[in-house]
Each structure stands twice: as structure tokens, then as C-alpha cells.
Amino acid sequence: MSDVIAEHAVDTSVEGDAKAALPVQSTKQFSVYEATSEELIERSMAPIKKEFLCPPPPSRSVKQNDAADVRAPQSGLVQEKKSKRQLKRERREQSTINLCPQVARTEDVDSCQYKDKCRFNHDIEAFKAQKADDIEGQCPFVASGMKCAYGLSCRFLGSHRDITGNSDDKEKSEMNFFNKETQRLLWKNKMTFTNADAKLKSLGLLGHAKKSNAAEEITAEKTQNGMNGTQATEVAVDSAVSSEHTSEMIQDVDIPGPLETEEVRPMKKAKSEDQKNSKTGDVGGVYDGVKLEEETKKNGYPTSKANVEDEDSIKIVETDSSLKLHPREKKKLIDFRDKLYLAPLTTVGNLPFRRLCKVLGADVTCGEMAMCTNLLQGQASEWALLRRHSSEDLFGVQICGSYPDTVSRVVELIDRECTVDFIDINMGCPIDMVVNKSAGSALLNKPLRMKNIVEVSSSIVETPITIKVRTAFFEGKNRIDSLIADIGNWGATAVTIHGRSRQQRYSKSADWDYIYQCTKNATTNLQVIGNGDVYSYLDWNKHKSDCPELSSCMIARGALIKPWIFTEIKEQRHWDITSGERLNIMKDFVRFGLQHWGSDTKGVETTRHFLLEWLSYTFRYIPVGLLDVIPQQINWRPPSYFGRDDLETLMMSESAGDWVRISEMLLGKVPEGFTFAPKHKSNAYDRAENG
């Protein structure tokens, strides 16, 4: 390359010997074999000991997802996208192959209550003939002293033995199961949210739904004399359902507009019309407490208990605002100080992984983010994210919503139906699908809506409300420091600050100096938790010593890559973990997964899927014994290297095919035509020029 540059320089020299004699700089090719540790770190490369380095493979382009190792043979035909009806038909046909769960459990074809109408197979002999081979090892239920609930369909059937345990022990070890009656009420829009709706109405946040409420009250008044009790009740119920449904539809609509718009405010013209004709009720204007009370008395509408409580609270405010109890004064106390907090992780932060982290030393756990709209629709898959294991002694759930009404109703519903220690509202999610619905980090541009969400949610339940935010929506436009002093007054118990903006994602290191600044600006009654790039006990110690006011640190990607980070922090050491110890940790995850998702074929493959999602993070771990400089930083890109044994080398592979091979060591062979592609781009590293 330097010869080409020199030749070009000679050919273009036209100003004499002086310019032609200028030296031509040659670019020396960088080599990881010759570079010092300092030079490697400057390039954000891991300083691995020279004896463990190896030449890179011939082609790196194939390894982007390396699904070719596990995909079915490709053909030139383009696969046609299946319709929902076709997929539903295929699922129905597949269910006829699967053995009825009740028959599998009891081994009695007459035990199924649906008899011939059951959509599952009742032919035990036919099922045994086509059932896949058993997996080596012991049934996770039998190993725990329980009776396996999957019976004949268990993939570890050969290890079953007569045991006096109860197959319902799973329900004792897990809680927050979704009640079918609750689901039915949500499906039919008959669920009541007394506290949330009363608070929303007192603050004027019900919006257009108030028109329906007023119509409901007028209808009830008119029908009292013209209908008997049963007819009046039916009309009232139908009107209430219509009102709730209308409110949900209106509040869930994402109205396009500038990001600075905080709330939809009433037109002055509409307000004047309302003043002229008060009998029509509120048409979306924001009422204060006195006006609401006067309208109720003037129109003679029936006053509920919730409205009486609202009137009392309004009178207290008018008399002396200092007498009103702050929402935090009525709440249960929760202390995050110096507790190891496992972040709520989408997809990989499932119940089995949280159990694993509890074993390894985590103190606080939180469920995966659940969308408020899906919870209000009664989606069982969304409610499954709220499930809790008995070992999670300090557990919270994380929800995400766009508007005060949907969030507050979900908060009231969770407080009523689930056992949780705190409810976290995600106001920092960067995912496009969430942001486009004005939820997650989009709320950072709408501080008034943030206030309304926190204020209403914290005032209707005794369960502590926490929020999670980022520094800002746009890079370079931090704004949490200007809101942190108010967040505590809104009623939040704690706030978690991720030291990046939504625009940054993971392109730069977390800004801990800004987190410290926000922590010092916070009120004394608000606990501040820092989040971002905690990857060793030294990181934890540094953040705690640099800012003593910081309550705790939330650990996210660090726990995914090396879940034993909790052990390292508690024991204050770098754990040079062996490949055998890492395999045992994976075995624990598989055991927890089979107990949670089931030991039948469906449960095994579900466990395999989430194991592979987790392995797409763990390969980034570099063993301590292979590094020249410790501890490893989360943004270091490793050169091509090998481990101290074959298993360690396999675990550090970025090939999806190698991850599948690890899963086969724990869960047997994959089904024919098995495919896997990671959901998250976990192999992305920060670029050196981004710091």
C-alpha cells in the first residue's frame, strides 16, 4: 500500500526536487499480537494474553447469525406467508397429536371431563408410538420431591418413580396466577376501577369519558321512575361497560402532534357552552374540586362513596393543604439502599433466570415489562409476566403505558389481584413500537403527563410506586435533573436513572456524572438508583463511593453476561469461574425452566428457546484468567481467541450453531428443521470513537 502511495506521489510531483523528496508516510498494519495492553484498550479491544490468541477464521460474514448451522436445507422456493386462519388450523391439528394433559397425568382415558369433545388426543398407545425419545437425566419435579404433573408426556418419563408428593406444589412455589374470572371480566369490559376512576375524575383526567359518565347518571335518574329495579340495574351496567370501553378506546389512540404537547386541553368555546348549559355535564373540560362538587349537588346525581371521599379530600385542601396526607405517608415502606437490584429484562428476565440470580446473590428482582393495554385486555401471555416465585422475597412488576387512566387502572388491578412489593412504571423504554404509542421514553418529552401518571397511581394504592427513566429523549438535551426534585413530591418512592438518552441506546458509555448530579438534586425522601455498565464489584464500589447519596445500582446486561456478578459484589472478588462451574449454572437454569414451563415437549422447547436467548449474551464473557488487565469492561471487543479447555472455547463462540450444541448437552437433540435467531442484538459493542 505504501509503494502505491509513493508511486502516486512521484508521478504527481511538478514543483521540483524539493517537493518530490518529501517523505511518504507508510501505514503500519495493526496487529493484536504486537500491540500492548494500553493500545488494545484504546481501541476498546480486550487485552487477552498472547498465548490464548489465534488467527481469525477465514470468513466472518457468515457468523452474523450463523443460522445456517441449524436451519433446514434451503431451497430456491420462496415460502408463502401463512394467514392467521391457516396458522390456527395448524395449531388445532397439532393439538390432536398431543396427549390430553388430564389423561397424561392420570393415565386414564376416562378422566377427561370433555370426553369426545376434547381437542387433544386420548389414544395413549398411539401417543407413545410417536413420542420423542426421553432426555437423559432426572425429571426436575421428581428431583425436587414432587409428583410430576405431566405424567406420560414428560420427556423424563424413565426417571419417574412412585412418590408421595403433590403435583400441585408448583402453585405453592409460584404466585400471581391469572384468575379466569378476572380475565372474563376484562374480556367483557365489566371490570370496575373504583379508586382509579374516582381519582381521575377529581383531577379532571377522564377526558371525553366524562360525557358517557354524565349520560349514564342522567339515564339512571330518568329510569328510576319508569323501570323496575331489575331493568334499571341492567341499563346501568350496560352504560357503565360502554363508558369504560369508550374511555379505553379514546385514551389508547395515539394523537399525532408535536412532542411538546402535554395534554389535550378543552377549547374555550366548549367551556362557555358548558357554563351556559350545566345539565349536559362535563364534556372534557378540566374541573376543579369545587366545581365538581357544585355540579353534583345541583344536578342531583347519585353520589357514590368514592365521590364522598373525594369531596372530603377537596374540603381538606381548601381548609389547609398541610393537613392532607402525602401519598407516600400512606404507603408501605421499602428500602432499596445497598441492595443488589436485578433489572427488569425483556425476554431474558424471565422467572427461571430471576430464580437463578436469587441463588447467586441478587436482593431485588422485577418482572419483565408488561404493556398496560394488553393487561387491561386480559391477555394471558402478558399476565404471565407478573408471575412471582416464592424465593423472590423483594419483588416488583414493571408496567408501561401512555396515559394516566390506563396506567392507574392497571396499578389498581395489580394491587388487587397480585402479590408484589412495588410497581415500577417504565418511562425510559427506547423501543420504537413503545415510543410510537407515546409510552416509554416518549414520556420524557411530556413532563405534565409524567406527573399525572405518577400522581394518580401513587394515590390510589398502598403499594410503593417507582419509575424508571433515561437522561433524556434526545442526546445532549438532558432534562431529568430539572424534574428530579418534583418526582418525589408526585408520590414516587424511588426513581431509577439509566445514564443514557433514548437516542444513544448503547452507542456510548453511561453518564454516571449526570446520575450523581441528579441524585444530589433529589429530595431526601426519594431513593435514586443508578443504572448503566455495572460489570464488576469495582464498578459498584466506585459508584457508591463517588456518590454516597445513591441508594443502589441496578444491574442489567452485566447480569445477563455473567449472573455471578452478584456473588462477586457480595464477596468483593473477581471470580475466575471455570467452564464446568458455568455449565452447572446453566443446568440450574434448565431445571428452573422445566419446572416453570413444563417437562413435556412444549416445555422443553420453550426452555431451550430462552436458554439460547440467554446464551446470546453469555458468550461475551471473557474469563479472568485469560486477561492481562482486569476487570473486563462491558464495551471491550475480544480478538479471536480460545479458552483453557474445549468447553470454555465452545461457550465463548459467537456462532448460533455452537449455542444450539450447548443446549443439546442439556436438553437433548433439537427437533428436525429447528431454527433460531436472537431477538436482541446482544453482540453489538460500543465503538471506540464513541467512548
Curated annotation (Swiss-Prot):
Catalytic site: 429 (proton donor)
Domain of life the protein comes from: Eukaryota
Xref: Pfam families: Dus (PF01207)
Key word Metal-binding present: yes
CC annotations in GO: vacuole
Zinc finger intervals, C3H1-type: 94-125, 138-163
Cofactor: FMN
Catalytic function, reaction form: 5,6-dihydrouridine(47) in tRNA + NAD(+) = uridine(47) in tRNA + NADH + H(+); 5,6-dihydrouridine(47) in tRNA + NADP(+) = uridine(47) in tRNA + NADPH + H(+); a 5,6-dihydrouridine in mRNA + NAD(+) = a uridine in mRNA + NADH + H(+); a 5,6-dihydrouridine in mRNA + NADP(+) = a uridine in mRNA + NADPH + H(+)
Its biological purpose: Catalyzes the synthesis of dihydrouridine, a modified base found in the D-loop of most tRNAs. Specifically modifies U47 in cytoplasmic tRNAs. Catalyzes the synthesis of dihydrouridine in some mRNAs, thereby affecting their translation.
Name used for this protein in its record: tRNA-dihydrouridine(47) synthase [NAD(P)(+)]-like
Species the sequence originates in: Arabidopsis thaliana
